[in-house]
A protein has these predicted regions:
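A short, Lys/Arg-rich alpha-helix, primarily the initiator
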Residues: 1-13
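Alpha-helical residues within helix-turn-helix
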Residues: 9, 19-20, 48
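Short alpha-helical DNA-recognition segment
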Residues: 15-32
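DNA major-groove recognition helix of helix-turn-helix/homeodomain DNA-binding modules
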Residues: 44-59
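Short, charged recognition helix plus adjacent turn
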Residues: 63-89
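Conserved binding/catalytic microenvironments
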Residues: 101, 105-111, 115-203
Length: 203
């Protein structure tokens, strides 16, 4: 579903007319085009429309995704479940998908996701024979986490997914880094909860 169609559904559910929502924000004709999927919208206008609907972006995207977690959250949830259930086949499928995304989009975070899955696979797959690869991948992930200037939700989840595999000294250093570099998000509940989980698991 396109974003405009999701907005229209929410607007109608709240009993707000096109004219009422568009008032002092944009023209009725523009809002109508956006809702039909015939026009894009700027972030600033979208923010104003959501504020009028008394809704934030997280809530809007949750509805847009058919009341399912977003792709990032879904990835960590699925990867963690496959690891805990020792589902090697699922881990391999996820890794293949992530690697294809990395090749297609050249976005480095897909690479780190693949490394995380490779680490999980090396632990649960009894036939896994590549010596030293798990340690090498963990080092690559650690290097990334130390290098990045600001930790957001992604970095915290990536670290949470690997911290139990790290040496105690490394965990202490990275947990301190996580706390310091994510401090600006302390009032954002989603990230704040992740910070608390990291600190709790460090103890």
């Amino acid at each position: 579903m396109e974003y405009g169609k999701t907005l229209r559904m929410i607007r109608q559910q709240k009993g707000i007319t096109l004219k009422e929502l568009a008032n002092n924000i944009c023209s009725v004709s523009f809002l109508s085009k956006f809702e039909r999927g015939d026009s894009d919208i700027t972030l600033s206008l979208m923010t104003k429309l959501l504020e009028k609907l008394m809704m934030n972006f997280d809530e809007f995207l949750f509805i847009h995704n058919d009341y399912q977690p977003d792709q990032l959250e879904q990835f960590f949830k699925t990867a963690g479940a496959a690891y805990l259930s020792r589902d090697v086949k699922k881990l391999k499928q996820l890794k293949e998908t992530v690697l294809n995304n990395w090749k297609q989009y050249s976005v480095e975070t897909y690479h780190y996701n693949a490394l995380l899955l490779e680490i999980y696979e090396s632990i649960v797959d009894t036939t896994y024979t590549t010596d030293g690869l798990k340690e090498y991948n963990i080092q690559l992930l650690s290097d990334y986490l130390f290098r990045v200037e600001v930790w957001g939700y992604y970095e915290l989840k990536l670290y949470s997914g690997t911290m139990l595999l790290l040496e105690p000294d490394m965990v202490i250093m990275l947990s301190r880094t996580a706390y310091e570099k994510s401090a600006r998000f302390k009032d954002y509940k989603k990230v704040s909860d992740s910070i608390i989980a990291v600190l709790f698991n460090t103890v």
